[in-house]
Amino acid sequence: VRFGVSISPELIEQFDELLTRRGYTNRSEAIRDLIRKELVEQEEIEGREMVGTLTIIYDHHVRELSEELIRFQHDHHMHVLSSLHIHLDHDNCLEIIVVRGAGPKIKHLADRILATKGVKHGRMVITSTGGDLPK
């Protein structure tokens, strides 16, 4: 389907600059990606099943933190699909936890981990499972 959109010259100029920086070869693919992004955000709001990664940095010397993180993952095994643990240096570890479940539920799980004493920094990225997204 083709459709037209009216956009100010200033806005389209900024949009084209963004597309160039991101490596898009045409506006159509960028617009499709923007639409998909909005659809994914709507899925999350509606509580549909989502997947995500929680990436955290923590000090493994904090008493019982490693055990607490492992226990939390086992307690929520129905949502935790996998985890990857990396030793960054003598004190700090990076852990990537892959989760799946209703958007609000996995966000809540991430918030609980991020609030754990000893977790220095973290970020949750949630996206669609892809099943409901058109090409």
List the predicted regions and their residue ranges:
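Short amphipathic alpha-helical segments
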Residues: V5-I7, F15, T25-R36
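Short, charge-rich, low-complexity interaction segments located
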Residues: I31, V40-G47
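Short glycine-/aliphatic-rich beta-strand segments at the starts of folded cytosolic domains
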Residues: R48-H60, L94-I96
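Short amphipathic alpha-helix segments
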Residues: H60-V80
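Helix N-cap motif at beta-to-alpha junctions
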Residues: H61-V62, V99-I106
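Short amphipathic alpha-helices in soluble, non-transmembrane regions
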Residues: E67-F72, H108-T116
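Conserved short beta-strand edge segments in small beta-sheet-based binding/regulatory domains
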Residues: M78-I86, D111, A115-G130
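Short, low-order "capping/linker" segments at domain edges
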Residues: I96-R100, D132-K135
